[in-house]
Curated annotation (Swiss-Prot):
One of its GO terms (molecular function) is four-way junction helicase activity. Residues 258-350 are annotated as: Head domain (RuvB-H). SUPFAM superfamilies: P-loop containing nucleoside triphosphate hydrolases, Winged helix' DNA-binding domain. It comes from the Bacteria. This is Holliday junction branch migration complex subunit RuvB. PANTHER family: HOLLIDAY JUNCTION BRANCH MIGRATION COMPLEX SUBUNIT RUVB, PTHR42848. It is found in: Cytoplasm. Homohexamer. Forms an RuvA(8)-RuvB(12)-Holliday junction (HJ) complex. HJ DNA is sandwiched between 2 RuvA tetramers; dsDNA enters through RuvA and exits via RuvB. An RuvB hexamer assembles on each DNA strand where it exits the tetramer. Each RuvB hexamer is contacted by two RuvA subunits (via domain III) on 2 adjacent RuvB subunits; this complex drives branch migration. In the full resolvosome a probable DNA-RuvA(4)-RuvB(12)-RuvC(2) complex forms which resolves the HJ. GO terms for cellular component: cytoplasm; Holliday junction resolvase complex.
Length: 350
């Protein structure tokens, strides 16, 4: 299974990029959801503009598809500066980073996606650039090599990552602003769907937008992708308007159920229930049972199911919860109906 083939994947697709840019908000006032992040960034941006300074270096982290790139572009737009974008894997050599840094104007934003994937040698060059706005460059080779320092204009580095824990401490400590993006509520996603539909000129009833939103796994990127597919269905099999019924029929045809699960999610859960009596089962046995690679289960299938409380990782292996049985309308096994074992140490003072 290739993750990019799943309609409910939160990973970015090249074919989504053009449409995503067309519906991407450019101002904080248009940015839906993430109220704490929005309020804080509004304050920080206003303060920096009032002092006529570059915004502090900003780290944005959270699951894929929640709007890290969008927020980086909004920061540049609100600050009234240009943004140059790259990603960690692209910056292979110090020269790659130096070329970007030396072309920045005062106050500009340098956006580095997947910043946790920077190579150590590039990261070392980035430290003085972030802290002192200086670039150390080695000229020549061997005994004749010498280091020269170039002054850089004050700039803002905006780093984005889905794995903040993989950042080195020295790099993490150089960010003055750190923002975590959370999964979106269904109500906020419905607002995003209605906004995107309006930009696309697509008549959409509130109930239709809500039906799409509740199956979007808390992720705007998925919500917008589902909207485009429901638009196709409404155009061919409906009257061009997205109603709750049209959205329901379209998403059922796409095999996305009311919890946002697709065939792969349901197959994993049912395998645990039917072949392993709900678990626990080791990851390698589970991978063999559904003919998938271990890393596919760990990195692609499990995270959302764990986040929603349908699977637990235990020292003995994977276990489904009562939510999985109820989702499929199955009777709970006897062990799930038994009262919990009393804590032998309950009441003891520790």
């Amino acid at each position: 299974m290739i993750e990019a083939d799943r309609i409910v994947t939160a990973s970015s697709r090249d074919r989504d990029e053009q449409l995503d840019r067309a519906i991407r908000p450019l101002k904080l006032a248009e940015y839906i959801g993430q109220p704490v992040v929005r309020e804080q960034m509004d304050l920080f941006i206003r303060a920096a503009k009032g002092r006529q300074e570059a915004l502090d270096h900003t780290l944005i982290f959270g699951p894929p598809g929640l709007g890290k790139t969008t927020l980086a572009n909004i920061i540049a737009e609100e600050m009234g500066v240009s943004i140059k974008s790259t990603s960690g894997p692209v910056l292979e050599r110090p020269g790659d980073l130096a070329a970007l840094l030396t072309n920045l104007e005062a106050g500009d934003v340098l956006f580095v996606d997947e910043i946790h994937r920077l190579s150590p040698i590039v990261e070392e060059v980035l430290y003085p650039a972030m802290e002192d706005f200086q670039l150390d460059i080695m000229i020549g080779e061997g005994p004749a090599a010498r280091s020269i320092k170039l002054d850089l204009p004050p700039f803002t580095l905006v780093g984005a990552t889905t794995r903040a824990g993989m950042l080195t401490n020295p790099l993490r400590d150089r960010f003055g602003i750190v923002q975590r993006l959370e999964f979106y509520s269904t109500e906020d996603l419905a607002t995003i769907v209605r906004r995107s539909a309006g930009i696309l000129g697509l008549p959409t009833e509130p109930e239709g937008a809500f039906e799409i939103a509740r199956r979007a796994r808390g992720t705007p990127r998925i919500a917008n992708r589902l909207l485009r597919r429901v638009r196709d269905f409404a155009q061919v099999r409906g009257k061009g308007e997205i109603t709750r019924q049209i959205a329901d029929l379209a998403l059922n045809m796409l095999d996305v159920d009311e919890r946002g699960f697709d065939h792969q999610d349901r197959r994993l859960l049912l395998t645990l229930i039917e072949k392993f009596d709900g678990g626990p089962v080791g990851i390698d046995s589970l991978a063999a049972a559904i003919s998938e690679e271990r890393h596919t289960i760990e990195d692609v299938l499990e995270p959302y199911l764990i986040q929603q409380g349908y699977i637990m990782r235990t020292p003995r292996g994977r276990v489904v919860t009562r939510h999985a049985y109820l989702h499929f309308g199955l009777n709970l096994p006897k062990r799930m109906n038994e009262p919990p074992t009393p804590d032998l140490f309950e009441g003891d003072i520790v």
